[in-house]
Curated annotation (Swiss-Prot):
Homopentamer. SUPFAM superfamilies: Gated mechanosensitive channel. Pfam families: MscL (PF01741). This is Large-conductance mechanosensitive channel. It is a multi-pass membrane protein. The lineage of its organism: Bacteria, Pseudomonadati, Pseudomonadota, Alphaproteobacteria, Hyphomicrobiales. Keywords: Cell inner membrane, Cell membrane, Ion channel, Ion transport, Membrane, Transmembrane, Transmembrane helix, Transport. The gene is mscL. The chain crosses the membrane at residues 19-39, 81-101. GO terms for molecular function: mechanosensitive monoatomic ion channel activity.
């Protein structure tokens, strides 16, 4: 049973999947930083210093706080600014994946379109000898 598991775990697809998950997690952190630390502050600067991640709507009259963390302690809130930030994060990840997959497909297509290399003179001679030997055996 251990041998079967080792064979399964060492198959190319499983290892590729594990590497992809690890790289994806690291890439997710980079995109989160890009959105949270660069894009959203730029959008905030353009819109007059607004911080979208701190926008919320309280669902009860008990919510009187002015920042999201304190508002969550007071009661239920719709954290729509955080949702907006995460949606932008998702769109960036989806776009980057689209570009990467498109690039990979283009590379595969270029490899498939390349003609087979011409055989060298030795290979042609060996092929002729093989064909002659086949006809002689008949």
């Amino acid at each position: 049973m251990l041998k079967e598991f080792r064979e399964f775990a060492m198959k190319g697809n499983v290892v590729d999947l594990a590497v992809g998950i690890i790289i994806g997690a690291a890439f997710g952190a980079i995109v989160s930083s890009l959105v949270g630390d660069i894009i959203m502050p730029l959008i905030g600067a353009i819109t007059g210093g607004l911080d979208f991640s701190n926008y919320f709507t309280g669902l009860s009259s008990a919510v009187t706080a002015t920042n999201l963390a304190d508002a969550k302690k007071q009661g239920a809130v719709l954290a729509w600014g955080n949702f907006l930030t995460l949606t932008l994060n998702f769109l960036i990840v989806a776009f980057v994946l689209f570009v990467v997959i498109r690039f990979m497909n283009r590379l595969k297509r270029n490899d498939a379109e390349k003609p087979a290399p011409k055989p060298n003179p030795e290979q042609e001679l060996l092929t002729e000898i093989r064909d002659i030997l086949k006809t002689m055996r008949r």
